[in-house]
């Protein structure tokens, strides 16, 4: 997919850059694989704001994407590639030999009519899913399970992938996009290929209204708030905040390591 630009007929089109979705399915989603989605709008079950700057947004139907890929040794044909408003990459509708359908994450270079399969010792082909122990070192993969049978958790957003950098006993060494190398059970499943829509990172929203369609509210700086609302608030006239940058709850915003899971530290190589 390519990017599309707009002539500056209005202020909102000046500088706007969006992804051209002409090649995607233009109809409705597959009815049995969607359900209504109740938007939380940044609130918890008490109605209190737990994630600031979120509200509204266009109503979305949730597409039930299969991250587990448990239908082994059964060929599936890609029927169509669709836009999914709930994630940044595209999804594909596949039809199995038993006439059942599933939604999968769509990798780059996959086309309508391509055949894919899940299972052990299958062909190294874009869209095929297999255990890590059957994938050669250096191959780009996505939708990687952390625990065998737990469903894909790693590399699920637009244009992302990870690579196998080596083996360590019963574990595969996976190099993440951040540069981190992590040990994952070699029986865990992964899918071959890089995920679709790599130009997602290059879009420019162009206007405030498009942010509201996405469910994003305006972001107010802490230094212009009152002391009751933010640690940087208050002061006579324009102030610098008086302390190192922090979040509204007082947590350091610059470089504080927030990971606190000693149980899984042993799986992080570097």
Predicted regions located by residue number:
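Short, hydrophobic/aromatic-rich beta-strand segments within well-structured domains
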Residues: 92-93, 172
């Amino acid at each position: 997919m390519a990017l599309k630009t707009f002539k500056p007929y209005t202020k909102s089109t000046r500088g706007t850059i969006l992804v051209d979705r002409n090649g995607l399915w233009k109809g409705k989603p597959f009815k049995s694989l969607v359900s209504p989605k109740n938007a939380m709008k940044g609130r918890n079950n008490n109605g209190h704001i737990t994630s600031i700057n979120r509200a509204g947004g266009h109503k979305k139907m949730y597409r039930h994407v299969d991250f587990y890929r448990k239908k082994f040794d059964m060929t599936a044909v890609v029927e169509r590639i669709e836009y999914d408003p709930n994630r940044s990459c595209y999804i594909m509708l596949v039809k199995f030999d038993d006439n059942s359908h599933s939604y999968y994450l769509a990798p780059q270079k996959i086309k309508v009519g391509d055949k894919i399969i899940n299972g052990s010792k299958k062909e190294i082909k874009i869209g095929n899913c297999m255990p890590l122990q059957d994938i050669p070192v250096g191959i780009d993969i996505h939708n990687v399970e952390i625990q065998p049978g737990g469903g894909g958790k790693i590399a699920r957003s637009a244009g992302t992938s990870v690579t196998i950098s080596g083996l360590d006993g019963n574990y595969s060494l996976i190099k993440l996009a951040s540069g981190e190398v992590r040990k994952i059970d070699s029986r865990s499943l992964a899918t071959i290929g890089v995920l679709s829509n790599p130009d997602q990172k290059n879009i420019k929203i162009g206007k405030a209204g498009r942010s509201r369609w996405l469910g994003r509210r305006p972001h107010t700086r802490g230094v212009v708030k009152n002391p009751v609302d933010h640690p940087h608030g208050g002061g006579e006239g324009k102030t610098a905040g008086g302390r190192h940058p922090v979040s509204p709850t007082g947590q350091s915003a610059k470089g504080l390591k927030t990971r606190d899971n000693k149980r899984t530290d042993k799986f992080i190589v570097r």
